[in-house]
Amino acid sequence: MLPIETISASDLDDYMNRPDAVIIDLRTPEEYEKSHIRTAVNIPYENVKACRQFSRKKILILYCERGSSSLFAARELTKMGYQVKSVVGGIRCYQGSNLFFSTEHSRIKTNQK
């Protein structure tokens, strides 16, 4: 099994403005619209393969509600050759840290059936 790199919610801000990183919210579009981390794009967990649109040179930073779905998605994307980091504790830990939040929308279109 490939090791999955994790980062803390407080370390997430270090990646927000990096041109080599993409922050991905794996929650549902409804959850994303209520609140999400600034600069994050929404690719629901069920559509994680839509991440193939990103260059393998990018670091994909994944978060979900509590951190478990992002670990599963990180494992899949790592197998596909991506550099991936999963946020421990998900958005719940990020909220608890009183860090940046946004209600701006930036959703990636996926081929949903």
Go through each PLM region and give its residues.
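Short, surface-exposed ligand- or partner-binding patches at beta-edge/loop junctions that are enriched
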Residues: 63-64
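Rhodanese-like catalytic fold shared by cysteine-dependent sulfurtransferases
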Residues: 1-22, 29-59, 68-113
